[in-house]
C-alpha cells in the first residue's frame, strides 16, 4: 500500500502509514465500467475487505483473518478479537511499538462461527467488539464457548468502536496541544 490518497484516508481514521503499509494492500477494481482503488485487508481464504472514503465492501470469499504472532502454546496465551480491520489497525496504532498477542479479525460478526475453533484453542479471549447489540451478542456467544473471556468494549465507551475512540483521542490531543501553544495573556 503506497497510494498517498489511501494512506491519507487511513490517516484521517488515525492509522499511521507504516502500520497501513505493513497490514494492508492496495486494491484496484472495476465497478459498472469505472476503475476505483481502495485499501484491502486479506482474510485467510484469499478474499479481501475493501475500504475507501466512499465505499465499504468485500471481495469473495468472506472469511476471518487470523494474525498469529505467538509461537508458543495457545492454551497459555491470549487472543484479541476485533469486528473489523479498522479496529484491528486502531489497536496497533494505540499499542505502537509494543508486542501484540495473536488477533482474530471477524470482518463481520456474522463470521463469528468461522472463528470459534480458533478462539477455543486459546486460554483467554479479549474482545474488542462494537458497543452495540450485535457486539454484545457476539461477546455472549464467545463466553458460552470459551473458557476465559474479557469484554474490553467498556474501555472505549461512549464510542461505538475502537476506531472512533482512537479518532477522538487524536482530536483531543491536538486540541490540548493547541491550547498549550497559545500565548499567555
Predicted regions located by residue number:
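TOPRIM metal-binding catalytic domain and adjacent DNA-binding surface shared by DnaG-type primases
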Residues: 1-39, 179-185
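Surface-exposed charge patches
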Residues: 8, 89, 144
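Generic structural signal for bulky hydrophobic/aromatic residues embedded
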Residues: 9, 13-18, 44, 94, ...
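Short secondary-structure transition/capping segments
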Residues: 10, 66-72, 150-158
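Phosphate-handling DNA/RNA-contact segment within nucleic-acid enzymes
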Residues: 29-121
Amino acid at each position: 500500500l503506497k497510494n498517498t490518497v489511501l494512506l491519507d484516508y487511513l490517516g484521517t481514521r488515525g492509522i499511521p502509514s507504516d502500520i497501513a503499509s505493513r497490514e494492508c494492500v492496495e486494491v484496484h477494481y472495476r465497478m459498472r465500467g469505472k476503475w476505483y482503488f481502495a485499501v484491502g485487508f486479506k482474510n485467510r481464504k484469499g478474499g479481501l475487505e475493501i475500504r475507501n472514503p466512499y465505499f465499504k465492501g468485500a471481495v469473495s470469499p468472506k472469511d476471518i483473518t487470523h494474525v498469529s504472532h505467538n509461537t508458543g502454546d495457545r492454551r497459555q496465551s491470549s487472543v484479541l478479537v476485533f469486528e473489523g480491520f479498522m479496529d484491528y489497525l486502531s489497536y496497533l496504532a494505540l499499542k505502537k511499538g509494543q508486542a501484540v498477542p495473536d488477533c482474530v479479525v471477524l470482518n463481520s460478526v456474522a463470521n463469528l462461527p468461522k472463528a470459534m475453533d480458533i478462539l477455543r484453542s486459546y486460554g483467554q479471549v479479549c474482545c474488542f467488539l462494537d458497543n452495540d447489540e450485535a457486539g454484545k451478542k457476539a461477546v455472549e456467544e464467545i463466553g458460552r464457548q470459551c473458557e476465559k473471556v474479557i469484554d474490553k468494549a467498556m474501555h472505549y465507551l461512549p464510542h461505538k468502536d475502537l476506531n472512533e475512540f482512537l479518532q477522538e483521542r487524536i482530536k483531543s490531543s491536538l486540541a490540548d496541544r493547541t491550547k498549550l501553544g497559545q500565548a499567555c495573556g
